[in-house]
């Protein structure tokens, strides 16, 4: 969202709202007079989202018990309901910049604990454990929400001029072996189809960028990509005027060297992975690199983490914003 490595002293978002986040997609599009709104189908004040989301560049934040009326009071709430309630509010306000934080796929994953698992359980064809089947059933709600969103965009005749970006929040930690979640075994390995789990496998997922005009094209980036690459990638796709040096990530469609990093200094490139805990570099299949390569990437990772920390500690974005605006 803000292009920085999360701080190790608390929630990055809560700290960042005390400065001008002028590089977010919300703010950049807001300057171009896009209609803007952020939606969430859980409680408005959870994690102070009622305070943080307007700082991301959205004129209004609507959530359950916070302006988003009609959400059924179950846990977790329905993403499909959120889409169907919210789309009519902005679909005629073109161009628009809309942010959704979905919740239907949240834990826990059982028929007793999860309303979305109960709702969609019979839609899932899966022969494994009930826990994983409940997880998959819960995720189906977002699938149906996206089907509804795209259908409404198509009916309005604007699907070809709309970009949808879907990014995961975190791995499904409630599937891990844990007394907290009542799991006697690690269901993550079942879901991922592996026998062993490390952080590089655990955190693997996908970023989806969709537009109706790209339906016939299947562009796939094979190099490592992560959440901090989203902001520079979208900024370039939209032709926005920004300084890429201020962002940690890269444009994934550029020839910039790919790099994915973790706040604890582990990292992954197209050449291999480095585990900071064991201080071990494992080359990717068919790759050979020398120690100088590993040392160079370690230094880059350290600098990016230090930069992110100092931007937050010194409120550098606010200082820069004041300077650019002549304050």
Report the location of each language-model feature:
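Solvent-exposed soluble domains appended to multi-pass membrane proteins
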Residues: 1-327
């Amino acid at each position: 969202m803000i292009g920085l490595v999360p701080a190790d002293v608390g929630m990055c978002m809560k700290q960042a709202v005390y400065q001008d986040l002028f590089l977010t997609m919300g703010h950049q599009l807001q300057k171009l007079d896009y209609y803007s709104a952020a939606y969430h189908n859980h409680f408005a004040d959870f994690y102070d989202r009622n305070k943080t989301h307007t700082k991301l560049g959205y004129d209004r934040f609507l959530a359950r018990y916070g302006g988003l009326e009609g959400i059924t009071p179950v846990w977790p709430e329905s993403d499909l309901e959120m889409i169907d309630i919210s789309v009519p509010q902005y679909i005629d306000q073109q161009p628009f910049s809309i942010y959704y934080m979905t919740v239907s796929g949240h834990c826990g994953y059982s028929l007793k604990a999860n309303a979305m698992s109960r709702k969609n359980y019979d839609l899932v064809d899966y022969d494994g454990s009930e826990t994983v089947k409940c997880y998959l059933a819960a995720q189906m709600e977002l699938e149906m929400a996206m089907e509804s969103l795209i259908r409404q965009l198509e009916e309005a005749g604007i699907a070809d001029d709309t970009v949808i970006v879907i990014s995961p929040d975190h791995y499904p930690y409630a599937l891990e072996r844990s007394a907290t979640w009542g799991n006697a075994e690690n269901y993550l390995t079942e879901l991922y189809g592996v026998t062993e789990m490390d952080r590089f496998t655990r955190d693997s997922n996908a970023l989806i960028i969709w537009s109706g005009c790209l339906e016939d094209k299947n562009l796939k980036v094979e190099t490592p990509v992560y959440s901090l690459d989203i902001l520079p990638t979208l900024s370039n796709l939209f032709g926005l005027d920004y300084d890429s040096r201020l962002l940690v990530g890269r444009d994934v469609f550029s020839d910039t060297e790919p790099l994915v990093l973790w706040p604890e200094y582990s990292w992954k490139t197209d050449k291999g992975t480095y585990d900071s805990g064991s201080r071990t570099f494992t080359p990717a299949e068919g790759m050979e690199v020398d120690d100088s390569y590993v040392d160079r990437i370690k230094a880059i990772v350290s600098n990016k983490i230090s930069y992110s920390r100092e931007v937050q500690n010194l409120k550098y974005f606010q200082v820069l914003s004041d300077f650019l605006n002549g304050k």
